[in-house]
């Protein structure tokens, strides 16, 4: 069956327009359109609905066309030809890998298909995106080839969706109003085959889908003078502008030709959310506590060549991203530290702006490298009162609690001594009976009581006299010194008040 399918495809690719129209009319398909559109429909028909009657009709049309050649002695098997090589405009073909036509119905970027090359060139590869699960490859990474010396170039691409793909898109859930989970996305990157490439837009990019322009992510605003604004290069969703049927879709990519080479690819993907990735991480990414404990021992193992011995390492239970207590502690396997960050907030931040950089060591921490620390998860459930722990050399741990600052206030009760207020009442005392006794006639009794308490071994109370202050005490000392001087010198002589002339007495 596979050999017959390959033979039928080779026959279809060598048909003329009239042969293609007869074949499509035989099965009741539309016969209108350009030749590459007719070839697309015929290849789609052969790949997914190749019945014995259809194969017989293809063979009949082929033998009718090549009747004279088949009558010649020594007929040779038909060689695979390019679908548009015989009836196409003389335009520059694309450079790229060998094409499997049944998989892609419209690999006619820049208007031409491609001949299979004998020397297999390495293909352009794109990095895997955690939030996009690839379902089908609609167009392999294909280089954008300029057709003229103009700076602004246009590259068209024509393809059709299979009924199964259309059904998947229609039956998928909505992530938000008008946005399906299953999408047809366009990805653009540099034409570099040395390593997987990240998405990168060419200058002056514009994407048109079936006569309607598709929105492309804009630039981030830059507040720094002289710094070019950056653009988030992400997959471009084309689903809302496509024909969700067997009709042919046409995509035109407009781009600026400034010396760099770019490639485009089309994929059918399922977009995931941060909750989906978190659930997957909890399922397959949890590291056993014993393995984490062995890692701690390895970190704290005594190195004979080192003069400094590490007896413990402190790990904070606060997430460095949001300064909150960890709920799902995780880190990358490539990180050398034991400090973890919260997987919930890390995935949410990368869903909004994908960077995938570790917030602890600022090194790449891709989703495929993330693990959930089982030991730290267990510690979080057991140690609720501390925000920091210390791992010890034998693999155990202890909580680090914040030390309270020493207080300057006295430990015992304070007795307030003072004179009676204006109403003749004694001031309030912290200990009933003691303050009033000291300020009244019964102070001796209270003093005896205080002495008795000291003799019984109890700590005495601190006595503070609030009626004394620095100013009053200094004045009292000055008055006492003046009185002493007066007593020593005797009575002072009377001073005579000088009388000024010109003054009139008041009386």
Swiss-Prot record:
Consequence of substituting residue 335 to S: Abrogates sumoylation of LEF1 and increases LEF1-mediated transcriptional activity
Binding site for Zn(2+): 335, 337, 358, 361
GO biological process terms held by the UniProt record: cell surface receptor signaling pathway via JAK-STAT; central nervous system development; hair follicle development; limb epidermis development; negative regulation of canonical NF-kappaB signal transduction; negative regulation of DNA-templated transcription; negative regulation of protein localization to chromatin; negative regulation of transcription by RNA polymerase II
Documented effect of changing residue 337 to A: Abrogates sumoylation of LEF1 and increases LEF1-mediated transcriptional activity
Post-translational modifications reported in the UniProt record: Sumoylated. Lys-35 is the main site of sumoylation. Sumoylation is required for TCF4 sumoylation and transcriptional activation. Represses LEF1 transcriptional activity. SUMO1 is the preferred conjugate.
Keywords: Acetylation, DNA-binding, Host-virus interaction, Isopeptide bond, Metal-binding, Nucleus, Repressor, Transcription, Transcription regulation, Transferase, Ubl conjugation, Ubl conjugation pathway, Wnt signaling pathway, Zinc, Zinc-finger
Biased composition (Acidic residues): 474-489
Residue ranges of the region described as Disordered: 426-507
Segments forming SP-RING-type zinc fingers: 304-385
Pathway membership: Protein modification; protein sumoylation
Stored PROSITE patterns: PINIT (PS51466), SAP (PS50800), ZF_SP_RING (PS51044)
Domain SAP: 12-46
Positions with biased composition (Gly residues): 434-450
Modification type N6-acetyllysine: residues: 107
Catalytic activity, reaction form: S-ubiquitinyl-[E2 ubiquitin-conjugating enzyme]-L-cysteine + [acceptor protein]-L-lysine = [E2 ubiquitin-conjugating enzyme]-L-cysteine + N(6)-ubiquitinyl-[acceptor protein]-L-lysine
Subunit details: Interacts with AR, GATA2, LEF1, TP53 and STAT1 (IFNG-induced). Interacts with TICAM1. Interacts with MTA1. Interacts with PRDM1/Blimp-1. Interacts with TRIM32 upon treatment with UVB and TNF-alpha.
Protein name in UniProt: E3 SUMO-protein ligase PIAS4
Highest classification ranks of the organism: Eukaryota, Metazoa, Chordata, Craniata, Vertebrata
Gene expressing this chain: Pias4
């Amino acid at each position: 069956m596979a050999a017959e399918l390959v033979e039928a495809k080779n026959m279809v690719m060598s048909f003329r327009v009239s042969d293609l129209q007869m074949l499509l009319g035989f099965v009741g398909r539309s016969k209108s359109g350009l030749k590459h559109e007719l070839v697309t429909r015929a290849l789609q028909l052969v790949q997914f609905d190749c019945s014995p009657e259809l194969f017989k009709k293809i063979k009949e049309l082929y033998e009718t066309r090549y009747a004279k050649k088949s009558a010649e002695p020594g007929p040779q098997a038909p060689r695979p030809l390019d679908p548009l090589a015989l009836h196409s405009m003389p335009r520059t073909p694309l450079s790229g890998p060998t094409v499997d036509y049944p998989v892609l119905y419209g690999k006619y970027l820049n208007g031409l298909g491609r001949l299979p090359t004998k020397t297999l060139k390495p293909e352009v590869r794109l990095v895997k995106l955690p939030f996009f699960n690839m379902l089908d490859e609609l167009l392999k990474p294909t280089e954008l080839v300029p057709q003229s010396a103009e700076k602004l170039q246009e590259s068209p691409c024509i393809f059709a969706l299979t009924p199964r793909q259309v059904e998947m898109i229609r039956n998928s859930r909505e992530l938000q109003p008008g946005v399906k989970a299953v999408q047809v996305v366009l990805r653009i990157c540099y034409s570099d085959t040395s390593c997987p490439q990240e998405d990168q837009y060419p200058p002056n990019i514009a994407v048109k889908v079936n006569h309607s322009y598709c929105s492309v992510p804009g630039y981030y605003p830059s507040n720094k003078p002289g710094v070019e604004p950056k653009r988030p290069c992400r997959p471009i969703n084309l689903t809302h502008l496509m024909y969700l049927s067997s009709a042919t879709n046409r995509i035109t990519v407009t781009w600026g030709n400034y010396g760099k080479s770019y490639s485009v690819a089309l994929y059918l993907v399922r977009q995931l959310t941060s909750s989906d990735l978190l659930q997957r991480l909890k399922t397959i990414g949890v590291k056993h506590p014993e393995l984490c404990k062995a890692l701690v021992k390895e970190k704290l193992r005594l190195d004979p060549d080192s003069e400094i011995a590490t007896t413990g390492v402190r790990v904070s239970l606060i997430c460095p991203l949001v300064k909150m207590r960890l709920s799902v502690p995780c880190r990358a396997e490539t990180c050398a530290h034991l400090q973890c960050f919260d997987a919930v907030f890390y995935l949410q931040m990368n869903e909004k702006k994908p960077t995938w950089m570790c917030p602890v060591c600022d090194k790449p921490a891709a989703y495929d490298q993330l693990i959930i620390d089982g030991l730290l998860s267990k510690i979080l459930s057991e140690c609720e009162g501390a925000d920091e722990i210390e791992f010890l050399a034998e693999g155990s741990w202890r909580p680090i609690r914040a030390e309270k600052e020493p207080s300057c206030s006295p430990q015992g009760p304070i007795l307030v001594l003072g004179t009676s207020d204006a109403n003749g009442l004694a001031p309030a005392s912290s200990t009933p009976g003691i303050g009033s006794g000291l300020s009244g006639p019964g102070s001796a009794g209270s003093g005896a009581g205080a002495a008795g308490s000291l003799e019984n071994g109890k700590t005495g109370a601190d006595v503070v006299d609030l009626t004394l202050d620095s100013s009053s005490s200094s004045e009292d000392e000055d008055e006492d010194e003046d009185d002493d001087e007066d007593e020593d010198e005797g009575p002072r002589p009377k001073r005579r008040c000088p009388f000024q002339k010109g003054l009139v007495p008041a009386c």
